[in-house]
From Swiss-Prot:
Keywords from the UniProt entry: Cell membrane, Fertilization, Membrane, Secreted, Signal, Transmembrane, Transmembrane helix
Protein name in UniProt: Fertilization-influencing membrane protein
Organism expressing this protein natively: Mus musculus (Mouse)
This protein's GO CC annotations: extracellular region; plasma membrane
GO biological process: fertilization; fusion of sperm to egg plasma membrane involved in single fertilization
Signal peptide stretch: 1-23
TM helices/strands, residue ranges: 85-105
Disruption phenotype: Deficient mice have no overt developmental abnormalities. Furthermore, no deleterious effects on testicular histology and sperm morphology are observed. However male mice are severely subfertile, their spermatozoa show impaired ability to fuse with the oocytes.
Keyword Transmembrane: yes
Tissue expression: Testis-specific.
């Protein structure tokens, strides 16, 4: 890159750090680009703050946005077997890597 380009980037970064130029528009300082446009509507947060177990609210929101709701049925099988297999695999992998490390490391001084 040429020196003048680096100088321009440095000046721009300095001005952005000092606050003399805006790097992104602020919400309260923006105006609508079309005359007669309404300001942005505030989203009602309480409508969206619902627990995942509230099936009626989930179905209502799914219908509102036009999705086909998917419901998952909890089965009687416990995740204990899968969790035991996963933890056992991770432990075996850890000891295998530790064994490989100890096998290839030479603890003698000098080389």
């Amino acid at each position: 890159m040429k020196l003048w380009l680096w100088v321009a980037v440095g000046v721009w970064m300095l001005m952005a750090e000092l606050g003399t130029i805006e790097t992104a528009p602020r919400r309260d300082g923006t105006r609508p680009s079309v005359s007669g446009a309404r300001p942005q509507q505030v989203v009602n947060r309480l409508f969206f703050d619902y627990p995942d177990s509230d099936r009626a609210s989930l179905l209502a929101v799914a219908r509102f946005i036009g999705e086909k709701p998917i419901t998952f049925v909890k089965t009687d099988s416990s995740p204990g077997l899968f969790q035991n297999i996963l933890v056992g695999t991770l432990v075996v992998a850890f000891f295998f890597l530790l064994f490989q490390f100890c096998l290839h490391v030479n603890f003698q001084k000098g080389a």
